[in-house]
Amino acid sequence: YKIISGYRRTKIYLSYLITCIIEGLMCLFTYMFIILIFGLFFLEPSSLSTIEILKISIEVILLTISFTSLFTLLAVLFADKTLTVVISTIIVFGLSVLSFLMLEHLKEPEYINQNVISDNGPVLEITKNPKYLTGTKRKVYEVTNDILPSSIAWRISDLSVIDRNNVMYYMIIFTLICNLIGISILNKKQLR
């Protein structure tokens, strides 16, 4: 960050954030335009309603803003740009793997069909799934899964494997938390 005399650090942080958000959204819209053109000519029409497509588009825009907020926070934490890029890549990869694993655990059914051999031959029996998460562990997985942008990205790509009703609120909360932390760190940071 370059501190310009006469400007508060909060304004500098927010201007950097807004610039990054605009750049991220420009990349997103370019990508969406290319996919739209490609899809019109080479893919079948979508089975989703217009409302669902608009909702997913808004979620993807908020997802871009959430990741941009996270990357801006990381840029404040580390002065070295190369280190920031490496750490950002590792964090995004780690969050993606963590989110994927959490979603897989949350998708487990509560009951499963199990073949049991009896005197009359094989019988199909419904039993409780030992992999199904319950209690506090399930709540922790659900809350973490709802807040992390990488989990939201997995859910959007799966087209609503798990309920996405509150996704927009969680992304706004995540964005606000990242920005508040980033602003407070920049305000306390000793600069040369």
Annotate each PLM feature:
Residues 1, 74-75, 170:
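Residue-level marker of motif borders
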Residues 1-17:
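Interfacial "coupling" helices/loops that link adjacent transmembrane helices in transporter permeases
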Residues 7, 78-79, 189:
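Membrane-helix interface residues
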Residues 14-83, 87-88, 103-104, 122, ...:
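Secretory targeting signals
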Residues 93-188, 192:
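Terminal transmembrane helical anchor/hairpin motif
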